[in-house]
Amino acid sequence: MGTGFAIGAVLFAVTGIVTVLIWPRERSSAASVASVEFSDAIAKLDVKQLLRSFIPPTKNCRDFYFALMGRLLLILGWNMISGYQLYILQKYCGLSVKDSAATISTMSVISMVVLIVTSMVSGPLSDRLQRRKVIVAIGSVIIAIGVAIPCFMPNALGMMLFAGIGGAGYGIYIAVDQALNVDVLPSQEEAGKDLGILNLANTVGQVLAPVVVGAIVLATGSYAALFPIAVVAVLLGAVFIMLIRKVK
């Protein structure tokens, strides 16, 4: 344990020093045209304009909200399982604490490898095919398949298959979903605000997952019901994505 912390401290120190040494040196932008225009805009900003800037889009925003719901549901379904792996392995699969820890380590390696590979492939493929929503939906369906496996294999192998198949789908999803979100923005003038709203789906999904999981476990006394409900959430997310019209 002590050696691990020491190695981590050295790595943090070295990377910090290297970053400072090689960081690009740029001249101050204080006198640039963009900086002056930004300062003028801040000076003219009033309270009404500020409050209006926080209002979600209301025009030409059908696809925007479908993308928002698609992301929210997928993140919810994914975190219902990935965020509770330890409890699922112990209470649902019947593994000991030691075996659960070892299984989670293996799952982490599996999911990391497949996520990197699929994200590296699906991003360029999406650009080449000029397809966004279809690839995002395919990734969602693959995630749903991975989530469904432990329903029929309530053991360590089933969870490892979840990590592999679900991780592959998640890699496809995260590589293309943000590009899809950019394509459905209703206004280029408010792109930053609207992207911020879309990204809130990540946080809301992660916050809702413990609430939903806790309610299900309390109601059923088991973790078994998590899997079908998570599958439904992810597939509903795919449906919302496919309902988008603006993007292929």
Residue ranges and their predicted role:
Residues 1-10, 215-234:
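A membrane-interface helix-boundary motif in multi-pass transporters
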Residues 16-22, 173, 208, 228-248:
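Multi-pass alpha-helical transporter architecture, strongest
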Residues 26-69:
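Juxtamembrane intracellular "pre-TM" segments in multi-pass secondary transporters
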Residues 83-102:
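Short amphipathic helix-loop junctions that connect adjacent transmembrane helices
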Residues 118-131, 217:
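Helix-to-loop junctions at the C-terminal end of transmembrane segments
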Residues 134-149:
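Structural signature of the two symmetry-related core transmembrane helices
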Residues 172-186:
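Intracellular juxtamembrane helix-capping segments at the cytosolic ends
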Residues 189-219:
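A late C-terminal transmembrane helix in Major Facilitator Superfamily
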